[in-house]
UniProtKB/Swiss-Prot annotation:
Keywords: Acyltransferase, Endoplasmic reticulum, Lipid biosynthesis, Lipid metabolism, Membrane, Phospholipid biosynthesis, Phospholipid metabolism, Transferase, Transmembrane, Transmembrane helix. Pfam families: MBOAT. It is found in: Endoplasmic reticulum membrane. The chain crosses the membrane at residues 9-29, 52-72, 84-104, 158-178, 211-231, 263-283, 353-373, 396-416, 431-451. This is Lysophospholipid acyltransferase 1.
Length: 462
């Protein structure tokens, strides 16, 4: 069976099928990295295998595109360390935005196409974090946050270490994003990967098989659901004839269906990182310790679908990118001695939107996300203000927050899926902008009905 027939049998284009085959191939390629003997050999293998898979997936030009942010990051570290992080951030994002605009990648993805822009998105985050951590390496530890202390780089990585980190076995295809310091310790057998001090080497095979089985289930469910809930339905006359509840139910199912594609992709990338050994994140504290593989984890499916609060969504969806946004945007916008507020949240969501592309649907989704999280916090504060003795009322507030999250998340997700301004507004307007009005209403209401703690704070002795 040729590529065209194979692609047709599963309903994708030849380009997407080629990418999927190379993407799945990252699992055996990453496994082979385990048997590469030396530290230098691991760096060379990681860089070469990543570049080769990129060539097979997207063509020769993809590696030329990848060289641009990689060069920006390395040159900024070599030339001007005091500002290398901010230089890489703005120049790296500028190039990524240029590629988004030139290739109109969102339209290609929406129509079943593929290009290297998605991999460039992951690579951009990796080079920025590396530069920022190298910048942090020259700062005093006392003024740094815990994440900065943990990930700071005292010495500049060599060029081959840098290339291996950026392209490691195709991990730039869909993530997860990881830190340069972790990559170096993994290749050198240091830190949690040190097996010289009577530490046993964790076996990755059970966790890898679980991730592969999860990927298979996710893909099967996605292929079953996607013909039943096409995104084109939002602009069809039949959709406008439906009642409010049916329209809203369709929005929920369209968002639910789309998420399984991402669950599949992240499960494959998780399997790839786990089997290489890089996904190892330490041992549990049980009497009989078990290995943890959280470094590779990018999604908690049940955590997303059953989230009790919108605040939990960034902790369980695209986990490593959410962590990156928290460490390199959100926390760095907070001045010392002050608390983060809505500005930091909105700025972080804006960066996330720009990272995805300059489509109106992305912008509206991430602004909606900021409103959704802020509204969910209001409900939570009201819940916490209820006396513990009123357990039933507290549980009702928890359930209300769950329903609120389901409603606003799937309403907001339409913009992320359809991308265009007209289609997004048509879908939002068809349900009377309920997913926008409710969060804004909650935020405004919080000023009228502020939450008071259920127990007054004890007065300090004078």
């Amino acid at each position: 069976m040729d590529m065209s027939s194979m692609a047709g049998s599963i309903g994708v284009s030849v380009a997407v099928l080629r990418f999927l085959l190379c993407f799945v191939a990252t699992i055996p390629v990453s496994f082979a990295c385990r048997i590469v003997p030396s530290r230098l050999g691991k760096h060379l293998y990681a860089a070469a295998s990543g570049a080769f898979l990129s060539y097979l997936s997207f063509g020769f030009s993809s590696n030329l595109h990848f060289l641009v942010p990689m060069t920006i990051g390395y040159a900024s570290m070599a030339i001007y360390r005091p500002k290398c992080g901010i230089i890489t951030f703005f120049l790296g994002f500028a190039y990524l935005i240029g590629c988004h605009v030139f290739y109109m990648s969102g339209d290609a993805w929406k129509e079943g196409g593929i290009d290297s822009t998605g991999a460039l998105m992951v690579l951009t985050l990796k080079v920025i974090s590396c530069s920022m951590n190298y910048n942090d390496g020259m700062l005093k530890e006392e003024g740094l946050r815990e994440a900065q202390k943990k990930n700071r780089l005292i010495q500049m990585p060599s060029l081959i270490e840098y290339f291996g980190y950026c392209l490691c076995c195709g991990s730039h295809f869909a993530g997860p994003v990881y830190e340069m310091k972790d990559y170096l310790e993994w290749t050198e057998g240091k830190g949690i990967w040190d097996t010289t001090e009577k530490r046993k080497k964790p076996s990755p095979y059970g966790a890898t098989i679980r991730a592969i089985l999860q990927a298979a289930i996710c893909m099967a469910l996605y292929l079953y659901l996607v013909p039943q809930y096409p995104l084109t339905r939002f602009t069809e006359p039949v959709y406008q004839e439906w009642g409010f509840l049916r329209k809203f139910s369709y929005q929920y199912m369209a968002g639910f269906t789309a998420r399984w594609k991402y669950y599949f992709i992240w499960s494959i990338s998780e399997a790839s990182i786990i089997i290489s050994g890089l996904g190892f994140s330490g041992w549990t504290d049980d009497a009989s310790p078990k290995p943890k593989w959280d470094r590779a984890k990018n999604v908690d499916i049940l955590g997303v679908e059953l989230a009790k609060s919108a605040v939990q969504i960034p902790l369980v969806w695209n986990i490593q990118v959410s962590t990156w946004l928290r460490h390199y945007v959100y926390e760095r916008l907070v001045q010392n001695g002050k608390k983060a507020g809505f500005f930091q949240l909105l700025a972080t969501q804006t960066v996330s939107a720009v990272w995805h592309g300059l489509y109106p649907g992305y912008m509206m989704f991430f602004v909606q996300s900021a409103l959704m999280i802020a509204g969910s916090r209001v409900i939570y504060r009201w819940q916490q203000a209820i006396s513990p003795k009123m357990a039933m009322l507290r549980n009702i507030m928890v359930f209300i927050n769950f329903l609120y999250t389901v409603l606003v998340l799937n309403y907001s997700a339409v913009g992320f899926m359809v991308l265009s301004l007209h289609e997004t507004l048509t879908a939002y307007g068809s349900v009377y902008y309920i997913g926008t009005i409710i969060p804004v209403g909650l935020i405004l209401l919080s000023y009228v009905v502020p939450a008071k703690p259920s127990r007054p704070k004890p007065r300090k002795e004078e």
